[in-house]
A protein has these predicted regions:
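Conserved NAD(P)H cofactor-binding loop of Rossmann-fold oxidoreductase domains
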Residues: 97-103
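Conserved glycine-rich cofactor-binding loop
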Residues: 22-23
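Substrate-binding pocket helix/loop in short-chain dehydrogenase/reductase
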Residues: 105-106, 113-118
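Catalytic loop of short-chain dehydrogenase/reductase
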Residues: 126, 141-172, 184-191
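C-terminal helical subdomain
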Residues: 182-239
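Conserved glycine-rich Rossmann-like NAD(P)H-binding loop of the short-chain dehydrogenase/reductase
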Residues: 38-52
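Conserved amphipathic alpha-helix within the SDR
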Residues: 54, 58, 65-68, 73-89
């Protein structure tokens, strides 16, 4: 469980939108913001997953609103922000978790998969930053979680570089009271217990302890996941 001092973080009753909240890093980040008193907008392309994590957030004693939204589709992005404004009249922060995965070797990458990667991570980050500039005019934060470093193929590295460029550019044009930063995990998500270092950084960047921190890309070294028994170990245990 990821716990912080609420007084130190200053997240009580803050309105925080978490994309990709239904799974992986997004789910863990949403739960941690909830534990620290924030109202969490759980956004996911799968409405059932958005609703499920919203239910988990409410079980933690926080307020949650699920919204089905694909951040690579500009109309979905606009509708998501408009709905948040209708419900709350304001937004304090955004955590956008990029979601594309590719295990395809670079020499075998096809055009269709390349465009899917661009849509899922670069377009979505651009759209979220665009709306963030509009809806966070009173101050706040945008934290982007980039593709993990363990994905070493050149096309994934290019995606990371593009998102990093968006963070740098947004920092130059956003008001100084809006903090835009990025987090790069060392590996893919495996579960809240083993991903807590990433979650702590994502929550800290949205809190008062990071006031004035802008344009940073923070690499987070996560512990290796627990060893999974090989199939022959499992077979050995059968009667």
């Amino acid at each position: 469980m990821v716990e912080f001092s609420r007084d130190l973080l200053g997240l009580e009753q803050r309105i925080v939108m978490v994309t990709g909240a239904g799974r992986g890093f997004g789910r863990s980040v949403a739960r941690s913001y909830a534990r620290n008193g924030a109202t969490v907008i759980t956004v996911d392309p799968d409405v059932e997953m958005a609703t499920a994590i919203a239910s988990e957030v409410e079980q933690l004693g926080a307020t949650a609103i699920p919204i089905r939204g694909d951040m690579s589709v500009v109309l979905d992005v606009m509708n998501t922000f408009e709905k948040i404004e209708e419900l709350f009249g304001m937004l304090d922060g955004i955590v956008h978790v990029t979601s594309a995965e590719s295990k395809t070797p670079f020499v075998e990458l096809l055009e269709g998969e390349w465009y899917d990667l661009l849509n899922a991570d670069v377009k979505s980050s651009l759209y979220v930053l665009q709306q963030g500039l509009r809806y966070l005019s009173g101050g706040g934060f945008v934290t982007l979680v980039l593709p993990p470093l363990q994905r070493e193929q050149p096309h994934v590295a290019a995606i990371r570089g593009a998102v990093a460029g968006l963070i740098e550019g947004a920092t130059r044009i956003f008001p100084t009271n809006v903090r835009v930063n990025g987090v790069i995990p060392s590996r893919d998500p495996v579960g809240e217990e083993h991903d807590r270092s990433l979650v702590r950084v994502a929550v800290a960047l949205g809190s008062m302890v990071s006031e004035g921190v802008r344009g940073q890309l923070l690499e987070v070294l996560l512990p290796e996941p627990p060893h999974q028994p090989e199939i022959y170990d499992l077979l050995r245990e059968l009667p």
